[in-house]
A protein has these predicted regions:
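Periodic aromatic/glycine/histidine/acidic cluster detector
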Residues: 23-119, 124-144, 148-167, 172-214, ...
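Bacterial N-terminal signal peptides
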Residues: 8-20
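Bacterial N-terminal signal peptides that target proteins for export
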Residues: 1-9
Length: 245
């Protein structure tokens, strides 16, 4: 019995040594631009990983603090030297140096899938982008650092289709566009005081409508009228409100 126990223990210890050798930990270093570097003074990130059966189990850290830059993830071994790796499946979660979440995105069959979200270091959301099988699909948004929405755009089949709205940092409207396959067909814009700057329709790349300029006191400065992409009339006013020839 004692002899059997000793043999069993030896087998377990040997298996442990073999496993450690098989799954030996490695490191690869990146500079602040995400490029691999062997110059330690320029290292900004370090990736620690093991490889088993062609799959790398990895986690990224800020260097030299070793604060986590990512949660653990798995990628094909050939992706291990790519700073932003493409996962076969699962979530990639990144963190700011101060511990605030930076990004969460999910892969399915090596393609972005579902809602990807980014945050500023202050914890406020910076962007949201929906994906379906690697293509932009749905409504994406961007935000200012103060949390106010900067823009919102509709995607279909990986192109802008639908509305595209933009706002100033105080939340007042800046621009509204109607998009068809990444091209605007209607544009309406305002200045920071809420005055209309342009009201344009576009067909086959040709503009129709008006473009306005304003003085700081709210008086109209100029008005340009376009038809079939040709400027057909432009009127200027001075600060007193008189037409300038």
């Amino acid at each position: 019995m004692i002899q059997y126990w000793r043999k069993s223990l030896a087998a377990v210890l040997l298996l442990g040594v073999f496993s450690q050798t098989w799954a030996q930990s490695h490191s690869v270093y990146f500079n602040q631009h995400g490029k691999i570097t062997a110059t330690m003074s320029s290292v900004a990130y370090v990736r620690q990983y093991t490889v088993q059966s062609g799959i790398a189990k990895a986690q990224d850290f800020y260097y030299p603090s070793m604060k986590k830059y990512s949660d653990p993830y798995e990628v094909p071994a050939e992706q291990i030297k790519v700073f932003v790796p493409v996962l076969d499946n699962g979530a990639l979660t990144l963190w700011h140096f101060n511990g605030q979440k930076k990004m969460v995105g999910t892969y399915k069959n090596s393609k972005p899938n579902g809602e990807w979200t980014n945050w500023y270091p202050n914890g406020k959301k910076s962007a949201v982008m929906p994906y379906q099988n690697g293509l932009s699909e749905g409504t994406g948004s961007r935000y200012y650092r103060n949390g106010v929405k900067e823009s919102e755009i509709q995607f279909k089949h990986d192109k802008a289709n639908g509305y595209w709205k933009q706002w100033y940092p105080d939340g007042s409207p800046k621009m509204e566009m109607n998009m068809v396959n990444d091209k605007p067909t209607e544009i309406l814009s305002w200045d920071e005081n809420g005055r209309i700057l342009s009201e344009i329709s576009i067909s086959n790349g040709r503009r129709n409508g008006i473009v306005l300029e304003w003085y700081e006191d709210g008086a109209k400065k100029s008005e340009s009228v376009y038809s079939n992409d040709q400027l057909v009339k432009k009127t200027h006013w001075d600060k007193e409100g008189y037409v300038v020839e």
